[in-house]
């Protein structure tokens, strides 16, 4: 499996897997290893069906007791990436219910206003290695991003009703994101009650298609001029930028 290096914890992390798999497709093309990792996460969910943030392999495969909002959702994106690369329809069909469950569980964290509820619990959502980063807007963006992949998967395997339902909800959440997080005066997305400006919030709102491509380009240029914007820290976050 893909795992953290010897100076880290040597676990298989879901968020990391998504990027490791993308790098693999362009280099070693060890696609069976990606497949094995996806099946491992699907086979070892948490009690409520959520994909765990990471799994241990020794002394025997076991899911950690840690879950993160964004990491679970990235299982959906990673599965769609894998299918686009391999056209492995059997795996897509096998793992669809796990992917769908991540969307269902994430929706439970969304309020009646169509916005992901903010949370003060440490580690509820990763995005980047930063304690000062407010993650509400970024979490909404990750949910939208994963929902797009879920719609694509459902359409591909003939789950038209699922695709229609997810797409309808996606549009509601996307409009809510624009209304709740976009500051017209600043021309940027803000996050949390503190209305924090960060690179992560801009990036994930753009990836969630809350704004069009030209607006996204303008936002990325503009956030770079904001001295108070919370910057990116990890190579992990820089990838999405």
Regions found by a protein language model. Give the residues of each.
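Leucine-rich, amphipathic alpha-helical/linker segments
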Residues: 4-6
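Active-site core of glycosidic bond-cleaving carbohydrate-active enzymes
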Residues: 9-241
């Amino acid at each position: 499996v893909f795992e953290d290096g010897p100076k880290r914890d040597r676990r298989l992390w879901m968020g990391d897997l998504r990027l490791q798999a993308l790098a693999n497709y362009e280099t070693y093309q060890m696609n069976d290893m990606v497949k094995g990792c996806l099946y491992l996460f699907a086979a070892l969910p948490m009690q409520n069906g959520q994909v765990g943030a990471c799994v241990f392999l020794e002394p025997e495969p076991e899911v950690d007791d840690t879950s993160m909002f964004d990491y679970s959702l990235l299982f959906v994106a990673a599965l769609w990436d894998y299918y686009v690369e391999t056209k492995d329809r059997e795996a897509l069909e096998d793992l669809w219910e796990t992917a769908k469950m991540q969307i269902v569980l994430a929706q439970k964290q969304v309020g009646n206003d169509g916005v992901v509820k903010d949370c003060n619990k440490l580690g509820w959502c990763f995005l980047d290695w930063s304690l000062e980063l407010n993650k509400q807007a970024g979490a909404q963006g990750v949910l939208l991003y994963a929902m797009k992949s879920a719609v694509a998967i459902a359409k591909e395997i003939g789950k038209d009703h699922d695709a229609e339902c997810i797409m309808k909800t996606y549009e509601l959440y996307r409009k809510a994101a624009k209304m709740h997080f976009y500051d017209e005066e600043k021309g940027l997305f803000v996050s949390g009650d503190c209305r924090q400006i960060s690179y992560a919030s801009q990036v994930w709102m753009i990836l969630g298609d809350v704004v069009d491509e030209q607006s996204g380009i303008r936002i990325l240029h503009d956030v770079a001029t904001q001295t108070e914007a919370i910057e990116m820290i990890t190579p992990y976050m820089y990838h999405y930028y």
